[in-house]
């Protein structure tokens, strides 16, 4: 009669491994979420700059008038992804003749901590979001904090 040797892991060993995995996940997940949020905010700033460039081009070819997002799309200056949510942000342009405001509002509080906007001076500014719609975060005029 030969003795059969048990193979495998004990319940205690499995519980220790699961506990270690949970500890690592608890540390890593918030960091990953912050990284994703920072990437979405950087993308929003880049997209506002893209809209600024499109507005300058549109202005020079349309008798000194700025255009809305649909007008910029029709002119072929930006693509139609700006009609919806892009990287967690919704983009709007309010154009009235010789001025415009390009806004980037986070679609949720997880998408970004800041809303971004630009005026004809092409400086991208940020304002802290106070709600998911970011309606009060865009001041009128030249106020706001410049983005580096």
Regions found by a protein language model. Name each.
Residues 4-32:
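N-terminal single-pass transmembrane signal-anchor helix
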Residues 3, 41, 70-71:
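Extended, polar beta-sheet/loop recognition surfaces of beta-rich domains
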Residues 18, 45, 52:
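Conserved catalytic core of two-component sensor histidine kinases
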């Amino acid at each position: 009669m030969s003795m059969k040797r048990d193979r495998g892991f004990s319940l205690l060993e499995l519980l220790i491994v699961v506990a270690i995995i949970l500890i690592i996940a608890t540390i890593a997940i918030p960091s990953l979420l912050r990284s994703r949020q920072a990437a979405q905010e950087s993308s929003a700033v880049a997209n506002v700059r893209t809209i600024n460039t499109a507005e300058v081009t549109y202005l020079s070819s349309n008798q000194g008038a700025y255009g809305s997002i649909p007008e910029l799309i029709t002119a072929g200056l930006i693509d139609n992804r700006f009609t919806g949510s892009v990287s967690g942000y919704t983009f709007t342009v309010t154009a009235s003749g010789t001025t415009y405001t390009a806004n980037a509002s986070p679609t949720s509080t997880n998408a970004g901590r800041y809303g971004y906007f630009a005026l004809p001076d092409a400086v991208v500014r940020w304002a802290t979001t106070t709600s998911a719609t970011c309606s009060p975060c865009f001041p009128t005029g030249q106020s706001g904090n410049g983005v580096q």
